[in-house]
Design a protein with these regions (language model features):
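Extracytoplasmic/lumenal domain signature
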Residues: 1-196
Length: 196
């Protein structure tokens, strides 16, 4: 790149050959993708920095991979030639405050793209439509991290930590699945799921 990059490079496989491609974004928000030889595959100007790392998805269940990511104002899905997959990008009404979450509940490529706007979580399908079946109420304090999907036995849980120390464990519809009364210090907490 001609300008300094603003975050660590992201590696992902090129679907035709399996070779690793490298994505970087410079300080002017130009996303550039290079092949393993260092040759530029594409560059795309974005309206802001990518939040977190891009996610690799297979929208059409045909092994042709795409990159999904969010900036503070848009949800993007790009093909490996740099073109936006229609109908993306999706413009946000309010700024995105966390990296994009990508859920594939049944491992069937029926993705849910999860966006966080301060204390509101929205879910989008692969057609760029807001998922009407997900109705989470706004949290009382800002959301601390990207929502995460966990599967324990046959149940799905969406974990959403708040700055206040509250942890939400929700169902796929956004309803509280498990109520946690205790406050958690997320700054030092390392937690994991154990099954017996």
């Amino acid at each position: 790149t001609e300008k300094p990059i603003n975050k660590a490079p992201f590696f992902f496989p090129y679907w035709r050959t399996g070779e690793q491609y490298i994505a970087v974004q410079d300080i002017d928000h130009l996303l550039q993708v290079f092949n393993y030889k260092g040759e530029l595959v594409f560059s795309k100007a974005l309206e802001g920095p990518i939040l977190g790392q891009p996610q690799v998805v297979d929208l059409y269940n045909n092994s042709r991979l795409q990159l999904a990511f969010a900036t503070s104002h848009q949800l993007h899905i790009l093909a490996v030639n740099g073109k936006s997959v229609k109908p993306f990008p999706i413009e946000f009404k309010s700024p995105q405050t966390q990296a994009l979450g990508v859920f594939d509940y049944a491992n069937n490529h029926n993705y849910r793209f999860v966006t966080t706007q301060n204390n509101v979580v929205l879910m989008w399908d692969k057609n760029g439509k807001q998922v009407k079946g997900f109705q989470m109420k706004p949290t009382s304090s800002p959301i601390l991290n990207t929502p995460n999907h966990l599967r324990i036995e046959s149940r799905d849980y969406i974990s959403i930590p708040e700055e206040s120390g509250r942890l939400h464990l929700l169902s796929r519809t956004g309803e509280e699945r498990l109520k946690i009364k205790e406050k958690i210090d997320f700054s030092s907490a390392q937690w994991q799921v154990e099954t017996n």
